[in-house]
Design a protein with these regions (language model features):
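Aromatic-rich, lipid-facing transmembrane alpha helices and their immediate juxtamembrane interface loops
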Residues: 2-283
């Protein structure tokens, strides 16, 4: 990983990312209402109908990873969490919690009171705040498995990065009138662009692990969007996303998760290399 100068980040990447993310908001009014209450239900699971749905979701995702990854330290995940991932995970979680707070306040999405406990932290259900720490912790276990088992598939995958940038930017231009679509795409574009700037060698590894991660994502995200319940826990404003769902969740959620996870890994590598460089300079 090449460590970019602060000036390069300040004068190039940060303004470009800010423009991509912020431009759709200029002079744009969120269309109120129009929430999609029902998801595309695949099967009804009665035990999920109630205010403990989000808690059940967290327990089902967290307990296996905690047991195998932390208690048994499979694939050296315990060391990876404490030494490399914990600090960047918390930092990125705070950024995405702010995004969640903003979009909830704007009416881009809302939370069904029938499936949450009713206790809020900064206008978010406390279960939602926990999501930003539990789910990346679980998701990065998949990344760690691929990292150990499959030695960096596709390398830096620069060609794939450029192709994704072109395709996603075209989609961004077509969806600038939908706030969630535009923001999800712009966040993904910004993170891929940053991985190019820093010449991150782990992009291919991340893509391989993210593709595998889409399998459990379908189930666990589906639990929150009406795949297994009569109504969705997270209800989206139909005017602010493209209307395409995978199982029961909007395709934009993939960009949300992509940006969140790759941001953690980029920040982790940046901190590791910056500390290493500082240590070398002071020896």
């Amino acid at each position: 990983m090449r460590i970019p100068s602060i000036s390069k980040l300040v004068f190039y990447w940060i303004p470009a990312a800010a423009m991509l993310v912020g431009y759709p908001f200029i002079g744009y009014d969120i269309i109120a209402g129009g929430f999609e209450i029902h998801g595309d239900q695949l099967i009804s699971m009665q035990f999920l109908e109630g205010t403990y749905l989000y808690i059940i979701h967290h327990l089902l995702s967290f307990i296996p990873v905690f047991f195998f990854g932390i208690v048994l330290n499979w694939f050296d995940y315990r060391n990876a969490v404490w030494k490399e991932l914990l600090v960047p995970l918390v930092m990125m979680a705070l950024i995405f919690i702010a995004w969640d707070i903003l979009f909830t306040a704007l009416g881009v999405w809302r939370f069904n009171p029938a499936y949450i406990q009713g206790v809020s932290i900064i206008n978010l259900p406390w279960e939602e705040v926990c999501w930003f720490f539990i789910i990346p912790f679980c998701s990065l276990f998949v990344y760690q498995i691929v990292k150990i088992r499959w030695s960096n598939p596709w390398g830096s995958a620069r060609t794939l990065q450029f192709v994704l940038l072109v395709v996603l930017f075209g989609m961004y231009l077509l969806n600038m009138d939908r706030i969630y679509s535009a923001t999800s795409l712009s966040m993904t574009i910004s993170m891929i662009g940053l991985s190019l700037i820093v010449n991150w060698k782990g992009f291919g590894l991340f893509i391989a692990s993210f593709l595998l991660l889409l399998i459990p994502m379908g189930l666990f995200n589906g639990m929150l969007t009406g795949l297994l319940t009569k109504e969705a826990l997270v209800q989206y404003n139909s005017a602010e996303f493209g209307g395409i769902r995978i199982l029961s969740f909007p395709i934009e959620d993939i960009g949300f998760g992509f940006g969140f996870l790759i941001g953690i890994l980029l920040l982790s590598d940046f901190i590791k290399h910056r500390l290493s460089a500082d240590y070398t300079l002071t020896k």
